């Protein structure tokens, strides 16, 4: 019945908390300045919402974490290409929309922000029940990296094909471009370096 969608399943209802966050993952090798620029752009977009009371941005350093962040290992998010935007909303009695409705609105609005290819922006809502690593998580195991990546790409494509699965991401990302310089000792001598 679940497979053919005759019976819809929702394990826990959406909660209506007074906080949300947006996690930012630029491609590995990106500078903290680039991460901060994206965080500031996200902050500019979300502060246009009347329900947002305050915003705090973090780039290249872990944001203060709550119980949800403890389980999601937020304290490890300290690389230059990682950022977070923490949002405090008006108390639920002072706003008409639920935090989930606000999160959906934010998700749509931040799609318009120009970001480098391979950047992931995820709107994170505190879960109504116990915290989890992700709402939906697939772990791929295999003999070698090439096989794992090929299978992961198929799983990711399957996730992306489902309309209600949002903020699809993977942990292998896009490899950072590398610059390799070969130094010629003859040239160094010639230019007196």
Regions found by a protein language model. Name each.
Residues 34-131, 186-193:
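Solvent-exposed, membrane-proximal periplasmic/extracellular interface segments of envelope transport
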Residues 29-30, 93, 97, 143-147:
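A generic structural signal for alpha-helix starts
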Residues 20-22, 39-42, 55, 155, ...:
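Extended, hydrophobic alpha-helical segments in both membrane/secreted and soluble proteins
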Residues 144, 149-193:
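Beta-strand-rich non-transmembrane domains
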Residues 24-28, 57-59, 87-91, 123-125, ...:
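Flexible glycine-/small-residue-rich
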Residues 11-18, 76-83, 117-135, 139, ...:
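Flexible hinge/switch segments at interdomain interfaces of large molecular machines
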Residues 1, 28-34, 40:
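Interfacial helix-loop-helix hairpins and adjacent transmembrane helices
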Residues 1-28, 70-72, 94, 135:
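Transmembrane helices with small-residue packing motifs
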């Amino acid at each position: 019945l679940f497979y053919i969608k005759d019976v819809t399943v929702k394990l826990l209802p959406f909660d209506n908390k007074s906080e949300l966050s947006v996690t930012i993952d630029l491609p590995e090798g990106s500078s903290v300045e680039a991460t901060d620029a994206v965080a500031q752009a996200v902050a500019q977009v979300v502060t246009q919402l009347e329900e947002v009371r305050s915003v705090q941005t973090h780039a290249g350093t872990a944001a203060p974490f709550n119980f949800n962040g403890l389980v999601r290992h937020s304290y490890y998010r300290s690389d230059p290409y990682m950022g977070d935007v923490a949002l405090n909303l008006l108390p639920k009695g002072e706003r008409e929309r639920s935090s989930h409705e606000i999160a959906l609105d934010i998700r749509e609005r931040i799609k318009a922000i120009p970001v480098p290819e391979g950047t992931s922006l995820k709107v994170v809502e505190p879960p109504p029940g116990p915290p989890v690593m992700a709402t939906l998580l697939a772990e791929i195991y295999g003999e070698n990296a090439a096989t794992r990546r090929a299978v992961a790409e198929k799983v990711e494509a399957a996730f992306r094909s489902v309309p209600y699965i949002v903020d699809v991401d993977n942990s292998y990302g896009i490899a950072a471009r590398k610059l390799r310089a070969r130094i010629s000792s003859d040239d160094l001598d010639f230019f007196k370096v």
